């Protein structure tokens, strides 16, 4: 389900997983985290640290074999360090990403101007810019702050922020008018309006997020922490009651063995890895060039039930081009062509530009008339046009144009519906053109469904995720494209309020909803959705409303976001299963060591035939410690995700991480025992 660019970015991030500088920083941080305040955040590791201190006190007081006591103390201490190291290495990777972003933030001087049209120019430090200021940026200069272009267009290099080397076009009056501080203008000149306070820019927020400054536990993570705490408390009570029970059968238990039993009983593996898994989830989203504003957003993406997907750019390539002019009976093709071109001269959309291009190719002369008043397209009117010299030309959705003509007291030829249906059934978009009270004809806009998208939707369906296509097209076009793409449902002739209403309806049914948006009119729906993925190229309002921002501005990235979320949940579940399963083998190592001397029949539990009770304890504790760093790469990279049903995923993970979690420790503890015999003797 993942796209190739996402995979490539993730592989580049993984290549630096164990970079020397990252390792060194993580090692230092592991020791710095040995504070009560930090350890108490993880009940499991807090108990292990308490056991470490108690073992040290018992050994220092001269109880039992000093060598064995200090060995147990050292292994327990290293277990805590490894847990801290797992979290620290995830944080260090985040700080590495933040450092690269910080290099993009420069001490710049801005050319502040009086109005959007220019005026007197004043050079000021970028830190003095405030929302509402107008700034002029020319070729070769850096954009000093976040803002919206109000005049001009330019190609901009955003590699310092997004990692993409290809320049992007930003233009005033379009849905790609947003600029980010720290990026560089490669050509042309723009005036933009500042939208962010100093220290609150997009880059500043990115740095804070990837550094973990706003890192908070997700609801599922909190629930799992509470479960681990309850299990730890239960095992603590059980172990504390063992000496009294053993006393009834005349057995005296070594307190060091009791500490070892407790540490082996409690789920130390997942306890040590849980913080790293949460941090790594946000890092994986960042590796996919998606900025998640919280860990909760990443996690919820893995639980979504419904995806609301814009047709353009997500399901189709988003490059609708005018291909044919269809005049109605009695209308000359040149008349329709010229009217459509006039209505599109000031249209900044790709569709509008393609109409002008097609008209020119067919002989029209594109000269902007004087005293023309251009009518911009809005989601409410769903049409645009031009008023000039007594002529009123409109182009837009069929029903919107019909309503416009009928409002002037005119009737519409039945032929129009036939033309619209003919174009729509072919999967193209019909754009109706009218002048005054007369409908002139239909412009055919063609787009292509993306290759492989139908298979992706089939995978989502297998996982129980419903897909809903949102389009401004008429129902016939929407139905044709929906059938070709394989989506489960569609909303035709959609307006912003329709998106919001659909999200609320799905949520009322207990479902989690994800959607993509880039315009100001998408902001309410983005804010309402459980996962709102805003496009980096979109408006500031959209980016503020969403809980994720795609730096590549690719609407299809929502599918990759779902993959990252699923991988986050599967990784936590798989490692929790493994942690609980591998406790079984440790029971068979520790229990015979506790009771075999006094109760010979307990020796039957020594199924691994470990050499001695002390070696059994040391082998179990060593495995318990070493398994944490051994699983760090898996925790950070995530368990490999294959789209399938929840039942199939559960079966696969139980087989690999459940059964594997039982069998691997048996073999590992036996090998460690053999190594101890070879090193220390029987």
From Swiss-Prot:
Q: Which reaction does it catalyse?
A: K(+)(out) + ATP + H2O = K(+)(in) + ADP + phosphate + H(+)
Q: Where is the active site?
A: 310
Which is a Pfam family this sequence falls into?
E1-E2_ATPase
A GO cellular component entry from the record: potassium:proton antiporter complex
Query: Which residues bind Mg(2+) per the record?
Result: 518, 522
- The record lists ATP as bound by 347, 351, 377-384, 395
Which topology term describes how it sits in the membrane?
Multi-pass membrane protein
- Phosphoprotein recorded as keyword: yes
Q: Does the keyword Cell membrane apply?
A: yes
Which keywords does this Swiss-Prot/TrEMBL entry list? ATP-binding, Cell inner membrane, Cell membrane, Ion transport, Magnesium, Membrane, Metal-binding, Nucleotide-binding, Phosphoprotein, Potassium, Potassium transport, Translocase, Transmembrane, Transmembrane helix, Transport
MF terms (GO), sorted A to Z: ATP binding; ATP hydrolysis activity; magnesium ion binding; P-type potassium transmembrane transporter activity
Q: Where does it mainly reside?
A: membrane
A GO biological process held by the record:
potassium ion transmembrane transport
Q: What Enzyme Commission number(s) does the record list for this chain?
A: 7.2.2.6
InterPro entries named in the record: ATPase_P-typ_cyto_dom_N, ATPase_P-typ_P_site, ATPase_P-typ_TM_dom_sf, ATPase_P-typ_transduc_dom_A_sf, HAD-like_sf, HAD_sf, P-type_ATPase_bsu_IA, P_typ_ATPase
* Cell location: Cell inner membrane
Which segments cross the bilayer? 44-64, 66-86, 233-253, 257-277, 588-608, 616-636, 658-678
HAMAP family from the entry?
KdpB
Q: Its family?
A: Belongs to the cation transport ATPase (P-type) (TC 3.A.3) family. Type IA subfamily.
Function of the molecule:
Part of the high-affinity ATP-driven potassium transport (or Kdp) system, which catalyzes the hydrolysis of ATP coupled with the electrogenic transport of potassium into the cytoplasm. This subunit is responsible for energy coupling to the transport system and for the release of the potassium ions to the cytoplasm.
Write the protein's name: Potassium-transporting ATPase ATP-binding subunit
């Amino acid at each position: 389900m993942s796209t190739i660019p996402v995979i490539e970015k993730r592989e580049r991030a993984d290549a630096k997983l164990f970079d020397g500088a990252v390792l060194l920083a993580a090692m230092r941080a592991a020791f710095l985290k040995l504070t009560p305040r930090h350890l108490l955040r993880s009940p499991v590791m807090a108990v292990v640290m308490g056991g470490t201190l108690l073992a040290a006190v018992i050994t220092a007081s001269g109880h039992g074999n000093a060598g064995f006591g200090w060995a147990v103390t050292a292994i327990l201490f290293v277990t805590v360090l490894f847990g801290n190291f797992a979290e620290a290495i995830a944080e260090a990777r985040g700080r590495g990403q933040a450092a690269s972003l910080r290099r993009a933030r420069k001490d710049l001087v801005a050319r502040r101007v009086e109005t959007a049209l220019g005026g007197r120019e004043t050079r000021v430090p970028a830190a003095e810019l405030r929302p509402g200021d107008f700034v002029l940026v020319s070729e070769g200069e850096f954009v000093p702050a976040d803002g919206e272009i109000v005049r001009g267009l330019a190609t901009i290099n955003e590699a310092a922020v997004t990692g993409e080397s290809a320049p992007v076009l930003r233009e005033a009056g379009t849905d790609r008018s947003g600029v980010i501080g720290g990026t560089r203008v490669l050509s042309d000149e723009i005036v933009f309006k500042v939208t962010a306070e100093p220290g609150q820019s997009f880059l500043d927020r990115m740095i804070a997020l990837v550094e973990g400054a706003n890192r908070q536990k997700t609801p599922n993570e909190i629930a799992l922490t509470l479960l681990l705490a309850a299990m730890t408390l239960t095992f603590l009570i059980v172990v504390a009651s063992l000496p009294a029970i053993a006393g009834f059968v005349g057995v005296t238990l070594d307190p060091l063995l009791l500490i070892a039993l407790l540490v082996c009983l409690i789920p130390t593996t997942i306890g040590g890895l849980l913080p790293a898994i949460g941090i790594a989830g946000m890092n994986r989203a960042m590796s996919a060039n998606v900025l998640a504003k919280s860990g909760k957003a990443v996690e919820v993406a893995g639980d979504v039930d419904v995806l609301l997907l814009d047709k353009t750019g997500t399901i189709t390539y988003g490059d609708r081009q005018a291909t044919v002019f269809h005049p109605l009976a009695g209308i000359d093709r040149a008349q329709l062509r010229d009217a459509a071109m006039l209505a599109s001269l000031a249209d900044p959309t790709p569709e509008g530009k393609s109409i002008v291009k097609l008209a020119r190719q067919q002989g029209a002369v594109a000269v902007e008339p004087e005293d023309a008043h251009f009518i911009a397209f809005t989601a409410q009117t769903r049409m645009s046009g031009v008023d000039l010299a007594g002529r009123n030309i409109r182009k837009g959705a069929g029903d919107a144009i019909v309503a416009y003509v009928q409002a002037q007291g005119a009737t519409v030829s039945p032929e129009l519906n036939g033309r619209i249906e003919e174009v729509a059934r072919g999967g193209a978009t019909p754009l109706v053109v009218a002048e005054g009270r007369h409908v002139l004809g239909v412009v055919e806009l063609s787009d292509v469904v993306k290759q492989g998208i139908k298979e992706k939707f089939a995978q989502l369906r297998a996982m129980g995720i419903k897909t809903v296509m949102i389009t401004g097209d008429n129902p016939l076009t929407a139905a044709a494209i929906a059938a070709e793409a394989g989506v489960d449902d569609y909303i035709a002739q959609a307006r912003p309020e329709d998106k919001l209403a659909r999200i609320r309806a799905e949520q009322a049914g207990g479902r989690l909803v994800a959607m993509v948006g880039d315009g100001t009119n998408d902001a309410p729906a983005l804010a309402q959705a459980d996962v709102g993925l805003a496009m980096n190229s979109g408006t500031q309002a959209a980016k503020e409303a969403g809980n994720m921002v795609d730096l590549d501005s690719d609407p299809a990235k929502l599918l990759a976001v779902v993959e990252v979320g699923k991988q986050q949940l599967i990784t936590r579940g798989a490692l929790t299963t493994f942690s609980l399963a591998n406790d079984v083998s440790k029971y068979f190592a520790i229990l015979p060591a506790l009771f075999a001397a006094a109760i010979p029949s307990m020796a039957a539990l020594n199924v691994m035939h470990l050499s001695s009770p002390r070696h059994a304890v040391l082998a179990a504790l060593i495995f318990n410690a070493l398994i944490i760093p051994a699983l760090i790469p898996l925790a950070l990279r995530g368990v490999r995700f294959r789209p399938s049903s929840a039942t199939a995923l559960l079966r696969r993970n139980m087989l690999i991480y459940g059964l594997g979690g039982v069998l691997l420790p048996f073999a590992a503890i036996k090998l460690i025992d053999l190594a101890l015999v070879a090193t220390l003797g029987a």
